[in-house]
Amino acid sequence: MRQNNSKVIGVAGGVGSGKSTVLDILRRKHDAVICMADELGHEVMRPGTAGFDKIREAFGEAILSPEGEIDRELLARRVYRDPDQLRRLNAIVHPLVISEIRKRISERDCNRLFILETALLFETGCDQLCDEVWGVVTEDEIRIRRLKDSRGYSREKAESIMRNQHSNAALRTLCQRVLVNDGEPRDLEAQINVAVENLLENPK
């Protein structure tokens, strides 16, 4: 395989846009390595890590489960009611996650695509670690319908979440490539195949 298969691609998109489908296609059809920041966030909170110690020091023993682990649901309820507490948590977790992302990128298999998915790709500067960022855009009404069907969200809840994320227009500006996910899965897959081919044929 070609050396330039080691490209790093960031995938951005709002809730209900179909990012998970994009990641699945890249994994199945292009043997890509998927790095999800949310999973890394869990890892840096495990007992015995620096993240665990810092979070326990910042938020106290009350956020620990009976097993001595961080109760992520309890911690989430606590910080999302208080913007200052949320900023405090992010100040601990984000640098640790970014450090782990950098480590995994530096150690990646040079014969495989490396895909980075994080909700705060641009806000944390992780887009600068990528060769390209691909935005997944979907009409808002389609996203709302998907969220109702798959997660049981009300329209109000879906719209509230969407308002706090990058709009389709913003993604079209921020991203080097845009994948439109308004149609059938095969249409999305075809776009991904073309995007991968173009990226690998145009090394930087």
Question: Where in this protein do the model-derived segments appear?
Answer:
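Hydrophobic anchor at the beta1->P-loop junction of P-loop NTPases
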Residues: 11
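ATP-binding Walker
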Residues: 17
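Walker A/P-loop
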Residues: 20
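Short beta-strand-centered segment that lines the nucleotide-binding/catalytic pocket of NTP-utilizing
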Residues: 32-45
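ATP-dependent small-molecule kinase phosphotransfer cores
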Residues: 42-113
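Small-molecule kinase domains that catalyze NTP-dependent phosphoryl transfer to phosphate-bearing small molecules
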Residues: 97, 101, 128-129, 149, ...
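ATP-dependent NMP and nucleoside kinases share a basic, alpha-helical "lid"
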Residues: 99-108, 113-150
